[in-house]
Design a protein with these regions (language model features):
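Catalytic core segments in nucleotide and nucleic-acid processing enzymes
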Residues: 1-133
Length: 133
């Protein structure tokens, strides 16, 4: 199961019979969260894996953390790593110190430390739509 923050990226993802793509449009609503939690319970021990792909920014980090906390505790980031960040850095947007301080102050799960470090080292963020180029 792959949750995708941005509609353009969701629409461009290729179909794979063994994968369910879910457009998250940012944060899931309470009803959407309940549906996804029920789906997780129905799948039980069938070996389903959970991934989320998002903007490489503060919002993307927060959405991932929300999914991990409220829906899929074992969710993994997809294309939210150092390699992806530097591949698309040319499309990045410079951020001011106030924004970077919010990122700095956020306790992220281990799987997003690399992304947090990239944002803080470069001072920029990348919208997921940039990855369509």
């Amino acid at each position: 199961i792959i949750t995708v923050e941005n509609k353009a990226n969701f629409m461009e993802m290729s179909y794979d019979e063994g994968t369910l793509l879910v457009y998250s449009h940012g944060f899931f609503s309470p009803k959407e969260r309940l549906f996804l939690k029920n789906l997780r319970e129905c799948l039980g021990e069938q070996g389903a894996e959970y991934f989320h792909t998002s903007d490489l920014d503060y919002g993307g980090i927060r959405i991932f953390m929300n999914i991990k906390e409220k829906i899929f505790p074992d969710v993994k980031p997809l294309a939210m790593d150092e390699e992806t960040f530097f591949k698309y850095q040319q499309y990045g947007e410079k951020r001011d110190e106030k924004y970077l301080q919010k990122v700095r102050d956020t306790d992220v799960p281990a799987e997003l430390e690399e992304l947090k470090d990239c944002i803080l080292k470069t001072g920029c963020t990348i919208e997921q739509e940039s990855m369509l180029f």
